[in-house]
Design a protein with these regions (language model features):
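Bacterial N-terminal signal peptides that target proteins for export
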Residues: 2-11
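Bacterial N-terminal signal peptides
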Residues: 11-20
C-alpha cells in the first residue's frame, strides 16, 4: 500500500511539473485579425417573411443590434425551393474575403417534416449572394423515406483542405442523424 501511494505521489508531481514549465504554453496561438465586430445571422419565427435571413452586429459578442431595421437581407423566395429559409449559419472563409452561408430550405407552415433541401450561399460583400439548392431526396438515390433536412453548418477541415457541411436528417420513424459532406470548390454542391 505504501509503495502504491509513493508511486501515485511521484506520478502526480511529474504531471504537475509538466504544466508548470516556465515559458511553456499549452494554448494554440492564433494570428491577430483587425476585425472589429461580430456578425450574427438569424431568422425570427415560423410564419411569412419570418423564415428569412436577417443580420445583427455586436462589438463584444454578447449584445447584438439588428441591421436593416430587422428586415430580411436575402429574399427567401428567390434562393429557396420552398419560399422560406431557417437556421442560417455563416462562416468567413480561410481567404478572409469570402463568406459561406448555409440555411435550411423550409416553410414550417408545410409541416416540420416537409423539407428535403438546404441552400448553399457564397458572397464577397455580404449583400450579393450566389446560391445553390441541394435537394437530398432528388439528388441522391435511396432517400425515399427522407422526412427532413435541418440546420446545416459549415466548418473548414484543414487536414483535407475543404469546407465540410454537416446537417441533421430524419428518415422514416428513426432518430435524427448527423450527416456531412465536403463542398466543391465553388461551394455550389
Amino acid at each position: 500500500v505504501r509503495m502504491k501511494n509513493t508511486f501515485r505521489m511521484l506520478l502526480a508531481a511529474m504531471l504537475l511539473s509538466l504544466f508548470a514549465l516556465p515559458g511553456y504554453s499549452w494554448q494554440k496561438s492564433f494570428p491577430e485579425k483587425d476585425y472589429v465586430a461580430y456578425l450574427f445571422t438569424y431568422f425570427t419565427g415560423n410564419s411569412g417573411d419570418e423564415e428569412a435571413v436577417r443580420y445583427a452586429v455586436s462589438m463584444d459578442g454578447y449584445t447584438y443590434w439588428a441591421l436593416n431595421d430587422n428586415e430580411p437581407v436575402i429574399d427567401s423566395k428567390v434562393i429557396s425551393s420552398t419560399g422560406g429559409v431557417r437556421d442560417p449559419h455563416i462562416l468567413r472563409c480561410e481567404d478572409g474575403k469570402t463568406f459561406y452561408m448555409v440555411v435550411t430550405d423550409m416553410v414550417s407552415a408545410n409541416g416540420w417534416s416537409s423539407n428535403r433541401a438546404m441552400v448553399l450561399l457564397k458572397s464577397t460583400d455580404l449583400v450579393n449572394w450566389s446560391h445553390s439548392v441541394i435537394n437530398i431526396q432528388k439528388r441522391y438515390s435511396g432517400q425515399e423515406d427522407l422526412k427532413r433536412v435541418w440546420a446545416p453548418q459549415t466548418i473548414y477541415d484543414p487536414e483535407v483542405g475543404k469546407y465540410m457541411v454537416y446537417w441533421s436528417m430524419l428518415h422514416g420513424d428513426g432518430a435524427d442523424v448527423i450527416y456531412y459532406a465536403y463542398a466543391n470548390a465553388e461551394f455550389t454542391d
